[in-house]
Amino acid sequence: MKQSLYKLALATMITLSSTAATQAQTLGCVDAQKGDKSFTLEDLNFGGKNYHNMSPKNRWCTWWGNQLVRQDADACYLVNKTTGKETKLFGKNDINQWIAHTRDIKVHSLYQTSFPYANKSIVVVNTGSKIYTIDFKKHALLSEHNFENDENILETCPASEAVAYLKDNNLYVTRGLKVWQLSTDGSRDIVYGQSVHRDEFGIHKGTYWSNDGEKLAFYRMDQSMVTDYPQVDIPEIGFNHPETQSCIATAAPDKYPMAGETSHKVTVGVFNLNTGKTVYLQAGDPTDRYFTNISWSSDSKTIYMFELNRDQNDCHLVAYNAETGEKQCELYHETDEKYVEPQNPIVFLPWDSNSFIMQSRKDGYNHLYLCTLGKENKLNIRQLTSGKWEVMDMLGFNTKRKSIIIASNELSPIQRNIFAVDVKSGKRTLADDGGKGWHNALLSTSGEYVYDNYSTPSIPRKIAIVNTANGKATPFFTAEDPWKGYNVPEYSMGSIKNGDTELFYRMVKPINFDSTKKYPVVVYVYGGPHAHNVDARWHYSSRSWETYMAQKGYLCFILDNRGSEHRGKEFEQATFRQLGQVEMEDQMKGVEYLKTLPYVDADRIGVHGWSFGGFMTISLMTTYPDVFKVGVAGGPVIDWHWYEVMYGERYMDTPQTNPEGYKKTSLLYKAKNLKGKLQIIQGYNDVTVVPQHCLSFLKACIAAGTQPDFFMYPGEPHNMRGHQSVHLHERITQYFEDYLK
């Protein structure tokens, strides 16, 4: 696809539109593309029958030490890092031949293979129920772990070749022929080895192996005191029930701690494979506390974690003796008037077991800090990175050059680039291919190379192998434009100002755009924390549904308001204790800009969003009822009283301490303001935004005499799965077709 203009967000302004209230500048544009074909939702929507063919092709790779291996369903290939050429290592048929004598089922795909030992020709193949360890040079099966259907693999440990798994809600560890049962009281109320605190604070799992593989730290969560939300499972269509089984819907209650209510209690255990014993960290009473970002010392003798109070404004980094569970010392303490949100564990330097890297936003942006343990556990802290940009991820270390490999948005707020940071000087060197676009990198074991998978607004996908020391890139793969031959709209990106705050937007113009015509507009909104919609990926990260709507003759507009991610603490915390208010103010600046455009029909503006975006959709429809004619809100939060403790209280405090904020942001009191056409869509079995939200809003509308439309997906969670997603977007599209066009 031809790109006529692409400028970074810091580059020279291309066009300027000015009113007394709003300034806007266009920062980049990808031209429309003429073609003979038109899109369907089967092409563009996840779950669609042709979606796979319409997505940019990819190459799946992993590192074998410093060697790059490409994986596909049928074979694994060694990739030459300087030429990009491939040599076959082994195939699926080879694996099945080497394990044939085990009487087990065949391996059907090699995507789930790993090469955990840099200097050994060993591959680990995980089929879900079997884990095979194979020497692919000797063509020999070294070991296998067999798991029954009721056993859930949690985490394998290459260092000790042990595996942690769950069975009947209890935690087990196996190594060789030995099996240890770590718990006996596991149940729906007592949860072991799984993610806790509703997946907040960077928690995505519940087990943590020590570096030597001889100890396993794990979460234990007691949620017996948490109120059940009464979810219900209904029978599947066409399911033939046994004569002994009722065909009546069954109760499937879910533990759901709502804001201001009793939350669960979490403790951390440490199992020692050498002694077969478990100790628990002596962290004190776990009531109304959060334990997160578990990590280990280099020698596996000490365990660290961040401890946060329920108000989430007082955070401590604490060290514990991994043998006894005793508290050793508090290393670091951070407070904030609004909230502290620890998301990343500390990581020790590979060349210095006395120093580690910590991430913090204490200066207003997420940055790296070098921490060195001194006498009497005094922590010496030196800031390594600084500036009005954020470290987005820490990928690891280049041990030879003593540098840290990071992803950041230093070059532009809408980009993600890879840098090597020298630990001694703090100097940063670009370590990706070209410095433009959005880069996702996979770091080699030594840190000398990154597998750089990226896109730009005009490039669907490129992959390069980059030397982190000198930035030299070896091209590996370039995806063809999967939309070649189709009629594709123009995608542009720019910014507007709300006071001194710059806000980035994306615009998708209708196909066959005519500037002399007036077009209906759909404003797509999310608006919440830990997300953004506008960046320098292909088509400025446009959702495929926007392309479909452009084909239908709509202009689509998306703006990242204050509260969204990667713009610093002040930008995010502007919404504190008043979710939706500042966000609406920013979104309306976008609408003001739209109204200055001669091709926008200001009488036909619609809005659509999901989850937090559903909350924003109804907020906008009921706060500015004369602006938005049509809205579609999916899985909307209606009242923050009913959202989960960790997320809700971070941004709103508790209902007890912020009653005015909860009332002001509740949509129940705005049901009477609804004037336009509003459709609410909900997954019946949503455990994220429970159906109580939308059902209560419907009750409020009945009482107020307003008339929203409503549709529910039985059996579906917060997001529609599989082909039902196509059905969902057909419904959303048709609603705008019926009432906005």
Briefly describe each language-model feature range.
Residues 228, 300, 439-741:
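Serine-hydrolase catalytic core recognition
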Residues 2-3, 198, 543:
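Juxtamembrane/transmembrane-helix boundary motifs in multi-pass membrane proteins
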Residues 15, 147, 162, 259-262, ...:
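Sterically constrained small-residue positions within well-ordered secondary structures
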Residues 1-9:
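Bacterial N-terminal signal peptides that target proteins for export
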Residues 15-23:
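C-terminal segment of classical bacterial N-terminal signal peptides
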Residues 7-8, 24-440, 448-449, 459, ...:
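Beta-propeller folds
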Residues 5, 18-19, 565:
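Compositionally biased regions
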